[in-house]
A protein has these predicted regions:
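Multi-pass membrane catalytic core of lipid/isoprenoid biosynthesis enzymes
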Residues: 95-136, 239-276, 316-319
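Topogenic membrane-insertion module of multi-pass membrane proteins
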Residues: 19-67, 71, 171
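Extended hydrophobic alpha-helices typical of membrane-associated regions
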Residues: 271-331
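Membrane-embedded alpha-helical segments that form the functional core of polytopic membrane enzymes
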Residues: 48, 57-85, 141-148, 152, ...
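Small-residue-rich segments of transmembrane alpha-helices in multi-pass membrane proteins
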Residues: 45-49, 169-184, 244-248, 312-325
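Functional transmembrane core segments of multi-pass inner-membrane proteins
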Residues: 170-231, 249-252
Length: 331
């Protein structure tokens, strides 16, 4: 029940449909297993990284951004397929499930088929990364190799992160900090000064650190909400998410604190991005109000299928947050 595999797919078939799809078309089944509504998690860090580069250097490379995004999408889709198959093999998907139905558990796709499709997308991510490695060298490998492992190791391997209560930390680091800084690395490289400008690369990376943490925190809200929704089922299947370890009340407070932290750090990120917050603070009002409403929903919504709406709104909130950053003028 990872964020990657469930995410904001509130309108997907529910757990009540288990066993209803044994004869579903394989293409339709594979499309649902890819969880397309969750793939904004790959878009966000690439968008954020390019936004940082644009704000501080005045330009960004669309071709490199597209290559980075496509590679990230392949990794996330592979992760979604692995999660679908591995959670079923570990009996973590049951009839009590309140999230979207899993294709392996429903019988729509076999375990072997789902794993092979996951491997196909993993290979695609590797092939797409080769031009980036050729362009930027070993730092891309340093990011890529752990990313490849955790694509499988999120739910698989000897120490699956999702089963150890490390899902939120993983998302903050890899879908926030690492992905944003990786995008910046692809865009500007590691030279002391950004080519064609007088901007120091260190300033761009410093801004990327703050922005990456903010994006990671808001992505982690989605996995926290996901785990609150699935907590009762996870208690019976041995999946020790943070929601299971902390209890429902503390898990809700943690998700709210992630949203709060993303706004408390705005003055720091605004300075790093050369934004004049004192003159443009009013542009944040829609995002702040949305964030406050989301915090209220996280506190009040019952831990069942009604949380799927909160997941969808969490994704929209992240998009609004980053869109606000993007339209703000620099000093």
């Amino acid at each position: 029940h990872s964020f990657f595999a469930d995410g904001a797919a509130a309108s997907a078939p529910s757990s009540a449909d288990y066993g209803a799809f044994p004869h579903m078309n394989i293409i339709t089944s594979a499309f649902l297993a890819a969880r397309p509504k969750t793939l904004t998690a790959s878009l966000i860090p690439v968008w954020a990284g390019c936004m940082v580069v644009q704000k501080l250097t005045g330009s960004w490379n669309a071709s490199l951004a597209l290559l980075t995004l496509t590679s990230c999408l392949c990794l996330q889709i592979a992760c979604n397929f692995f999660n679908d198959a591995i959670d079923h093999a570990k009996h973590a998907d049951t009839e009590r499930r309140t999230g979207p139905v899993r294709m392996t558990a429903s019988g729509a796709l076999s375990h072997r088929t789902v794993m092979l499709i996951g491997l196909f997308f993993l290979l695609g991510a590797c092939l797409l990364a080769f031009p980036l490695i050729e362009l930027r060298g070993w730092p891309i490998l340093a990011i890529g190799i752990p990313s490849l492992y955790f694509t499988y190791g999120y739910t698989g391997g000897p120490w699956p992160l999702a089963y150890k209560g490390l899902g939120e930390i993983f998302v903050i680091l890899f879908f926030g900090l690492v992905a944003v800084l990786g995008t910046i690395l692809v865009q500007i490289g590691t030279a002391p000064v950004v080519p064609g400008t007088l901007v120091e690369s260190l300033a761009v990376y410093n801004a990327g650190i703050v922005t990456g943490i903010q994006c990671g925190l808001l992505c982690a809200v989605m996995i926290s909400v996901n785990n609150i929704r699935d907590r009762k089922e996870d208690l019976t299947t041995g999946k020790h998410t943070l929601a299971v370890r902390l209890g429902e009340g503390k898990a809700r407070a943690m998700a709210q604190s992630f949203i709060l932290a993303a706004y408390i750090t705005l003055p720091t990120s605004s300075r790093a991005l050369h934004l004049n917050l004192s003159h443009t603070w009013w542009m944040w009002i829609p995002s702040i109000l949305f964030g406050g409403y989301l915090m209220l929903l996280i506190r009040k919504t019952p831990a069942d299928s009604r949380m799927n709406r909160v997941l969808a709104l969490s994704s929209l909130h992240l998009l609004l947050y980053l869109a606000t950053y993007t339209i703000l003028p620099t000093r």
